[in-house]
Amino acid sequence: MRINYLDDDDLAFLPECSEAHLEAFTRILTHGENGKPRLSSTLLRNETFLAMEGHPERYRRNWQLIAGELQHFGGDSIANTLRRHGKFYRAILLDVCKRLKAKVDKQLSTPQIEQQLLAHFLQHSWNKLNAEQKAQFLAAVECRSHELDSLMAHLLRHRKLSEGVTLLLDERLTAILRTHAAVSVIGHGLVRGAGLNSVKAVSGSAYRVTIPAVLHIACLRQMLQPPSDTAEIGEKYPARS
């Protein structure tokens, strides 16, 4: 299967990531939470990607195919077919911000918007956890502080941001998607009889893929930054309610 990758400056950093980190990110795109391959994945049917199975740099050498897969999932499925490619990452990022109700400044750079999204997600997810879940989370990321600002700094300082976000997604993604599904049903009712306006509501972005994928991309970018740059995320870009 052919994957048409849009040349995207916001994804050009991917080959700088470690092979292990890229493999973990790719699995978000290609496999569901139950571990089963996604039927909608084009990457798992791509001959070039399949031919490199077992190669020590399979993911880094195919980063454009992986990025194209994300763009594919971020675009409207019908529109993808017509234009033969997906959406730029920034558009996907802003779409996820809207879905998670993260109020971000669209005039900022993509990395800055990602930082606002991460701060929003960590704050709101943390507040939804019960005492037992918080204790399990803190133990998993090896943090003793229950204060959110200290937790953010800890995740960044010890390079556990991706792990922390993944753990929170395991707890919160189902609830997030349930809310999205309810909104979608209401939306479908509102646009019924509106002709082509209803098509986008039915065939829109695959949020089960794009929400964790965008959060993971944001983590990967943060982890590549020097500690002095990442330590300010909680202070410089507090979650906006």
Where is each model-derived feature located?
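Phosphate-binding glycine-rich loops and adjacent basic patches that engage nucleotide phosphates
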Residues: G54-Y59, A131-A139, L177-H180
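Short, Lys/Arg-enriched charge-dense amphipathic segments
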Residues: V104, P111, L129-L138, G195-I217, ...
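Membrane-inserting effector segments that mediate pore formation, membrane fusion
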Residues: H146-R208
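N-terminal leader/propeptide segments of preproteins
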Residues: M1-K128
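Membrane-active amphipathic alpha-helices
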Residues: L117-L156
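Amphipathic, membrane-inserting segments
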Residues: M1-T30, G204-S241
